[in-house]
């Protein structure tokens, strides 16, 4: 995507208090674009099962190590599609590079990328772009960005930004068959009803874009905290009550409407998603709260197997000697684990 000067970014950001995020986004062509880059040839044959992976990459701050993770992890050797969240393009914190392109090039996949936020804090950012992506070893026929209803205005956050949460809706060509693939990132600074309202827009777009019998997979960080992300005292109290926290994590669907909402729209999530926690939320005292935020949900598909892959450095024992990952001394590649599901088309 074409860059905007830092001065232009600030000029546009200054309009947000008067106009609101969406009116300002209308003035920025990059928000109407969805980049699609088909970089590799399609596989010669369609396997019996396809491996779908959901992974919040946490901006790409450990880019080289993350590329090693994707290339070397035994559970990711035959992945077909990655539903990826939080990828920078031109931000100092991730080396001022295009994270989605670097990953796609290094792991041999096609990709689609959509802009979620323009960061306004750091004048050293070449672009300050931040968004979601979908990686596929199958050709991407088309892709579009879906802007979801605002549930939190990030302009007034310490991470001052222009933008809103997005979904990337893609049509894939898998051996001549159309398959829908949707990468979603819902708002963490919201409650259950806010996230439900965001997903409603995604389901509306799926209905417009695909025939009812087209298989579709949705994957991403749905931020199913089971609490309002703005309620700091509330989730601190939850963290300090292990029995209650365990109940929340065991029965996320009782606290987060997006899960029963999926079933109401013909999508299954129970057999496709991890029963383990997927995100380590930092808490006071160096502790963390393990949450179930990352999900895969599908229609027209059956799950054969699924699992979760730790992104904590201590668990990457399979890293090849001498690689960036093997040399990495940080505690984790991302604050999210990666989740996968092997799926076949329903008969």
Summary of predicted features, one role per range:
Residues 47, 127, 160-164, 287-289, ...:
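A generic structural micro-feature
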Residues 2-44, 87-178:
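Structured beta-strand-rich core segments of catalytic domains in phosphoester-bond hydrolases
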